[in-house]
A protein has these predicted regions:
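Solvent-exposed interaction patches of small proteins and small membrane subunits
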Residues: 1-156
Length: 156
């Protein structure tokens, strides 16, 4: 499938991987404790990079579904439904995301909710699984999408 829209998918995937890789670095750098400006910047930088990374991942998945003529999920739980659907084969297309990548995406989705709704109660120890999931996605998402693309369009 030589559809030029793959360029935007690839940009979204690269953005997701880049933001999530930086999230891992930011989490490792720490400095979250305290009420001073540096602690505030550390917390906000980590939460925003996680939010940006996951949002870029969702954008890539929606673009892929658009390319395939598949309607993306709608409704209150569309964010979770998007990952669940991408993790399974539907209507002749293979799963877009392998199980481990989908599991990590669910974790970053969960954390994005924290970043968007509960940022005042950020607890670094509770973010450890999310930072680990960000590492899984940063390392594995680009290859997972490339494998999917080759699977549906070996000549593309």
């Amino acid at each position: 499938m030589s559809d030029a829209r793959w360029a935007e998918v690839e940009e979204d995937v690269a953005a997701a991987a880049g933001h999530l890789a930086r999230s891992v670095e930011l989490f490792g750098a720490g400095g979250f404790a305290g009420e001073g400006l540096e602690a505030y910047k550390a917390r906000m930088a980590f939460m925003h990079s996680m939010q940006s990374g996951h949002t870029s991942l969702e954008s890539a998945l929606v673009r892929i579904m658009d390319l395939l003529g598949e309607e993306p999920p709608i409704g209150r739980d569309w964010h979770a439904d998007l990952i669940r659907r991408a993790a399974r084969a539907i209507g002749g297309r293979p799963a877009i995301l392998p199980a481990g990548i989908a599991e990590a995406a669910h974790e970053t989705r969960r954390f994005r909710h924290v970043a968007m709704r509960s940022y005042g109660t950020f607890e670094p120890t509770r973010a450890e699984p999310s930072a680990a999931a960000a590492g899984v996605l940063a390392a594995g998402l680009p290859d997972a999408i490339a494998v999917f693309r080759r699977g549906i369009d070996p000549d593309g």
